[in-house]
Amino acid sequence: MALPILLDCDPGHDDAIAIVLALASPELDVKAITSSAGNQTPEKTLRNVLRMLTLLNRTDIPVASGAVKPLMRNLIIADNVHGESGLDGPALPEPAFAPQNCTAVELMAKTLRESEEPVTIVSTGPQTNVALLLNSHPELHSKIARIVIMGGAMGLGNWTPAAEFNIYVDPEAAEIVFQSGIPVVMAGLDVTHKAQIHVEDTERFRAIGNPVSTIVAELLDFFLEYHKDEKWGFVGAPLHDPCTIAWLLKPELFTTVERWVGVETQGKYTQGMTVVDYYYLTGNKPNATVMVDVDRQGFVDLLADRLKFYA
């Protein structure tokens, strides 16, 4: 039986590819998709979810728009990474359907209530919507199997020296998620920076030759340009968000550790930092499965294999 998942995202090139991977995988049953502000403004990330589902002929999936700003802060977006639309590069179709007439939290709660088995929440943007769900519906915590997030890092940040972008945007929300008591799986920069897509991988995807694989290649063409900056020291572009879906499909591709994670919300230099108690110094029980390594070639092969689904 397929694993029921709720996808909360802020597309974003890598979010879009995570959607493509999830919907090409019969092991997963995507019950609903909610959008969050992050990589772009809330209007644009919602539109990008609708555009991607229109491209994939999955207008049957319920979509709802989430919070327009973080819990306690002003919104920061990553338009320098993802462009004016949030999905600059390919020519994507206009949305062929409308979102649900409800909020993201309402759609999430409805989905959890109606599911016969616990649902896995996959969150590839700031954690605002998930935190609002957890705070407003404690009675539904038991309906959540786990929360798989792309965010954080044990080591260096990518938005500040200490913080990864998704967590930095709304650290208070991320702290609510990590301390919720619900199992959390963290795909942080320690693993996503190893899940790099090289130019030859992009050409491999393009050569598959179907409309979706072509769009994915064009998304990566744009995404690779930003990551050519020498400061990163990358060979390709880190494909952050699809690591969450890939872990659900093939956990054997990833090396993980069980550790306690907290989020710094006050620090002068460290706001948004995920503090991973790697050496068990706090005495706190582990609250997260933290990804630390990936079989890069296996990850690329999985993407290439699933892109053939759209032939």
Swiss-Prot record:
An example Gene Ontology molecular-function term: purine nucleosidase activity
GO cellular component, one term: cytosol
Active site feature: H240
Keyword Hydrolase assigned: yes
BP terms from Gene Ontology: nucleobase-containing small molecule interconversion; purine nucleoside catabolic process; pyrimidine nucleobase metabolic process
Enzyme Commission number(s) from the entry: 3.2.-.-
One Pfam match: IU_nuc_hydro
Alphabetically ordered keywords of this record: Glycosidase, Hydrolase
Family assignment from sequence similarity: Belongs to the IUNH family. RihA subfamily.
Role according to the record: Hydrolyzes with equal efficiency cytidine or uridine to ribose and cytosine or uracil, respectively.
HAMAP family: Pyrim_hydro_RihA (MF_01431)
Protein name, UniProt field: Pyrimidine-specific ribonucleoside hydrolase RihA
